[in-house]
Regions:
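Positively charged n-region of N-terminal signal peptides that target proteins for export
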Residues: 1-5
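Bacterial N-terminal signal peptides
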Residues: 7-16
Length: 368
């Protein structure tokens, strides 16, 4: 339970844990350090050793009713829906483990969260004809989690899904849609869903935020961030972040709070970006359930049945399309009207801190 606190305490005390991570790494790694796509001196130690922040490899799930005994209505959860199954991964657990290796309806996935970057992302673990299992290296690059796969010990940048050191350097993992929403929203939308339980095999103070007030800072810890800060937005602004091929875009979440629907075109595809109130920041108050409201987001293709829909707000957490007058929710489901029951196709996205998106996607388009 002390490993995460050590990261923060060491940083604040100005320790030397920001030293190059590869300097003494060879003995504990089978990684090919001669193969890399980034300068090795950009990778620094975050404090904990290899697997010092332990991934959850044997996740246990409970019902919505059971999880409701220990989850607050506004607590953030990562949602993965695939093949008729839906699971919620509470940030109160991910904040202590950062990686959950799981399978949903036969699809091997890794659900990940880097608290220092607010990056909650899920990846398809099928890669190059095998299934990868991921762990934490104990390293950071530009303040972001560097993961490794246990099959080749390639190091992967969590915020981008890119292999940066080792066998798969230069290759990318495939994102799986994993929106970050409130527990109450998940309960209402998926009452029969499953929830990652606190039965992780580890003793942690689940529900407590070890990064208290982190997201009220003006920027990331200097020890862990050596990149250029992009002044187009405040460093700790949350953005809805999308990338595909050579295109990327970031939508300011504070702007979405004022205008909760944005119709756009990304990479040639008509999309809609939705924002809804009611989700707590996991990186604010000491108790995650008490964090300030930062909202939840959904991103979807807005073409259905061969026609492109245009959306507008229909009240907090509700949206209406101009073509049919159907009402939709933040999960992209029509709740009433001619299209009731239909769902829009989700577009994988993250709710990154701006500094963490801009440093990896410096040419990104910004909508603020």
């Amino acid at each position: 339970m002390t490993s995460l606190r050590f990261v923060i305490t060491a940083t604040l005390l100005g320790s030397t844990i920001g030293a190059p991570a590869h300097a003494h790494a060879a003995a504990q790694w089978k990684t090919d350090f001669d193969k890399h796509t980034v300068p090795l001196d950009e990778i620094t130690s975050g404090g904990p050793p290899k697997d010092g922040i332990p991934a959850v490899d044997r996740p246990v799930f409970v019902s919505v009713a059971e999880a409701d005994e220990w989850l607050g209505d506004r607590e953030p959860v990562v949602v993965v829906a695939y093949g008729g199954e839906t699971k919620a991964y509470p940030l109160q657990i991910l904040i202590w483990h950062e990686i959950v290796n799981d399978e949903i309806a036969g699809l091997p996935v890794s659900v990940t969260f880097c608290p220092l970057c607010n990056t909650a992302l899920a990846f398809d673990r099928r890669f190059d004809g095998r299934v990868l299992d991921f762990g934490t290296t104990g390293k950071l690059r530009h303040s972001d989690l560097v993961m490794y796969d246990r099959q080749t010990e390639t190091w992967w940048q969590q915020a981008s899904g890119e292999g940066i050191v080792g066998t798969y350097a230069g290759r990318r993992l495939t994102l799986v849609s994993a929106p970050l929403v409130s527990w109450k929203q998940f309960q209402q939308e998926y009452p029969e869903g499953l929830v990652l339980s606190r039965q992780t095999g580890f003793s942690r103070d689940y529900g407590r935020n070890p990064y208290q007030r982190y997201d009220t800072r003006k920027g990331p810890f200097d020890h862990f961030f050596s990149g250029r800060k992009d002044g187009r937005l405040p460093a700790m602004e949350r953005v809805v972040a999308l990338a595909e091929a050579d295109s990327s875009v970031a939508y300011s979440m504070s702007a979405l709070e004022d205008r909760p629907v944005l119709n756009d075109t990304f990479s040639g595809r008509p999309i809609v970006v939705l924002w809804a109130p009611g989700t707590a920041s996991a990186l604010d108050a000491s108790a995650i359930a008490d964090g300030r409201d930062v909202g939840s987001t959904g991103v979807f293709g807005r073409e259905i049945g061969g026609r492109v829909l245009t959306f507008e707000s229909a009240g907090p957490g509700l949206y209406r399309d101009a073509q049919t007058g159907s009402t939709w929710n933040v999960f992209g489901r029509a709740t009433s009207g001619p299209l009731a029951g239909q769902r829009l196709d989700p577009v994988p996205h993250g709710n990154h801190f701006w500094f963490a998106w801009a440093v990896f996607m410096p040419h990104t388009r910004v909508e603020s």
